Amino acid sequence: MPEPTTQIKDTTANPAPLGLLGFGMTTVLLNFHNAGYYELNSMVLAMGICYGGIAQVIAGLMEWKKGNTFATTAFISYGFFWLSLVALIGLPKLGFTAADETAMAVYLATWGLFTGGMFIGTFRLNRALQFVFGSLTILFFLLAWEHFYAVEWPGMGGASAGFKHFTGYEGLVCGGSAIYTGLAQVLNELYGKTILPLGVVKK
């Protein structure tokens, strides 16, 4: 007789809302700064380390346990993006050479390319995530453009404050969409029905 098999049911919670809210709330707070509402301060950096960084990495590890390659890649990557961004801001205070505007432009454009690739993956997921990753791709390239033109090439005046504020508002939209998507998953699961629609994609 064949030996009986034991199936282990996955009863762990959905970690995606944690990752989305960690990303979204930190993005919103940083982009209030970019939009001109306050100076860059320890509140933004602390959020970048704790909620945008560590919490997203934890969410990514939980997604790895569930076998979700896309979410694992996204959350761990963006978690370490926030940690690296805080390091780029903080390390010069410890005597390390600061990244110049060109280096920051390349850094942000590279993240834009990565996010564009992840955006293609959202075509198999839902409309809400498509908006999050699509708007994030645009945000990274706007930020890269801002730093590139801050170099003030001959004949160019550099990026204006208005452009930075525009980029900040785009970032607020991006971060807000991630918050919406995270809360939608929490509320829809809690109530057992669609409270906030995510725009299901037919596969």
Where are these regions (language model features)?
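Short, highly charged, low-complexity non-transmembrane loops/tails of multi-pass membrane proteins
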Residues: 191-203
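N-terminal topogenic module of multi-pass integral membrane proteins
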Residues: 1-59, 63
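Helix-adjacent hinge/juxtasegments
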Residues: 72, 81-107
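Structural signature of hydrophobic alpha-helical transmembrane segments
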Residues: 40-53, 98-110, 168-172
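Alpha-helical membrane segments in multi-pass integral membrane proteins
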Residues: 106-117, 127-153, 160-184
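Membrane-helix interface "capping/anchor" motifs
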Residues: 62-70, 120-131
